[in-house]
Design a protein with these regions (language model features):
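Acidic, amphipathic alpha-helical patches
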Residues: 45
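Acidic donor-binding loop of glycosyltransferase active sites
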Residues: 50-61
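C-terminal alpha-helical cap of glycosyltransferases
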Residues: 135-150
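Catalytic donor nucleotide-activated moiety binding site of glycosyltransferases and closely related
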Residues: 1-40
Length: 150
């Protein structure tokens, strides 16, 4: 995260929540404590969604939920070919079905963030396809359905 701090400067902080299977291997150095905040593995990821301005993810499905917030999502997949061919594969066409391009290097990722390079129309298209029922009135629809006279 030293490169991230150098590139992003004082304008950003990172809320870091690694996968629960590898979280015990991470330690944030003391001189990065005011830049990288380690999220407890037991803490609900939804808490992070509420306080974040953007999401950086790899292969996690968290982007489906986060997309509904209408905020930038960056896909950092430095090992894309290995993951696709030898590990798990995908349930979507990557990168075509994603709400943003895939980047494979830290340099590309940091440049996209610094340049505020995000295609909001692509995100809207993604949400129309994968989150079509999220129109801000879910509670109203539930109450109407439960208490309808018919």
């Amino acid at each position: 995260f030293y490169k991230w701090k150098r590139e992003l400067g004082e304008d950003y902080v990172v809320l870091f929540k690694p996968h629960y299977l590898i979280c015990s291997t991470y330690h944030i150095p003391r001189d990065l404590k005011n830049f990288v905040f380690f999220m407890d593995p037991n803490q609900d990821i939804n808490d992070a969604y509420l306080v974040s301005d953007a999401l950086i993810t790899d292969y996690s499905s968290v982007f489906f939920d986060y997309a509904q917030l209408g905020r930038p999502i960056y896909f950092y997949m430095y090992d894309l070919e290995h993951y696709a061919e030898e590990l798990r594969g995908f349930y979507l066409k990557v990168p075509d079905d994603l709400p943003n391009d895939v980047v494979k290097t830290e340099e590309e990722l940091l440049k996209m963030i610094k340049d505020d390079c995000f295609d909001y129309q692509r995100l809207r298209t993604f949400n129309e396809r994968f989150n079509p029922w999220n129109d801000g009135s879910a509670c109203e629809k539930i109450v109407s359905e439960v208490f309808s006279e018919t």
